[in-house]
C-alpha cells in the first residue's frame, strides 16, 4: 500500500482559521498499514504530524518514507524502525515491483517534488503542489497513463486553466484533479479537461 501526502486531521486551521477542512475525516484511513509513505513537500497539509503518527509512531512495522529534504527532516522526527529516504528531484526507489522517481515541481516550499510511480504496467504521475513551469516537462516522460494535478489556484498551485494546459502538454491518458473541496468549495466539474476522472472523497477510482 502507498500513501501520498496524507492529511487526515484539522491541523492547518490552527495556523489559518480560513483553512478549516470542509470534509470530515474517515477514520478508517488512519488504520491503513502502508508499505510506503510519500510526502512531496514540507507544508502542514502534506507532512501532518497528527496524521503521520498513525503510520509511523503508533506502529511496530517498518515503513519506507520518501520525502525531499525539508519534508524528510520533519518526518524523520518520528524515529522508529522506518526507512527514511531523502527523495529529492531525480531520485529513484524500488519497493517490490513498484518503481518511484521524483521530478521537479514549482511551489513555495524550497524542495518540492512530483512523483512518477510505475506499477502493474502503468505510469502514474502525481504532480504534487505546483505551478505551471516549463522546466518541469524536462523530467516527464511522454507515456504517462494517469496524472493527478492540483486545480485550486491558490497557495502556489495551478488554477483550472493552467492545470488543463499542463495536462494537455503532458498528454496523460487520464487526468485526475486534486486539491479541491478540502479547504474550499470548488466544483471539479468546472475543470474543462476532456479525459478527466473526478474522484469522490474516500472512494476508490479505477484508473
Place the predicted regions along the sequence by residue:
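Pre-active-site segment of Zn-dependent metallo-hydrolases
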Residues: 2-38, 50-54, 131-142
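Structural motif
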Residues: 2, 35-36, 98, 122-124, ...
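Metallo-beta-lactamase
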Residues: 34-46, 60, 66-121, 175, 195-207
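Binuclear metal-ion centers of metallo-dependent hydrolases, dominated by the metallo-beta-lactamase
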Residues: 79-93, 138, 143, 162-207
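A short helix->loop->beta-strand "cap" motif at the edges of active sites that frequently abuts
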Residues: 58-64, 170-174
Amino acid at each position: 500500500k502507498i500513501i501520498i501526502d496524507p492529511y487526515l486531521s484539522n491541523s492547518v486551521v490552527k495556523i489559518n482559521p480560513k483553512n478549516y477542512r470542509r470534509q470530515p475525516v474517515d477514520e478508517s484511513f488512519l488504520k491503513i498499514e502502508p508499505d510506503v509513505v510519500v510526502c512531496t513537500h514540507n507544508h502542514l497539509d502534506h507532512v501532518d504530524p497528527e496524521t503521520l503518527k498513525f503510520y509511523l509512531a503508533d506502529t511496530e512495522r517498518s515503513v519506507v518514507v520518501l520525502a525531499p529534504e525539508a519534508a524528510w527532516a520533519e518526518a524523520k522526527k518520528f524515529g522508529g524502525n522506518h526507512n527514511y529516504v531523502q527523495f529529492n528531484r531525480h531520485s529513484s526507489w524500488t519497493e517490490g515491483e513498484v518503481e518511484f522517481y521524483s521530478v521537479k515541481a514549482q511551489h513555495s516550499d524550497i524542495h518540492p517534488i512530483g512523483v512518477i510511480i510505475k506499477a502493474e504496467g502503468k505510469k502514474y504521475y502525481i504532480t504534487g503542489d505546483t505551478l505551471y513551469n516549463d522546466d518541469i516537462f524536462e523530467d516527464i516522460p511522454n507515456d504517462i497513463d494517469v496524472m493527478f494535478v492540483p486545480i485550486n489556484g491558490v497557495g502556489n498551485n495551478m488554477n483550472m486553466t493552467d492545470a488543463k494546459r499542463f495536462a494537455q502538454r503532458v498528454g496523460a491518458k487520464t487526468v485526475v484533479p486534486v486539491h479541491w473541496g478540502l479547504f474550499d468549495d470548488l466544483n471539479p466539474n468546472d475543470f474543462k479537461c476532456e479525459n478527466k476522472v473526478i474522484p469522490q472523497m474516500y472512494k476508490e477510482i479505477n484508473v
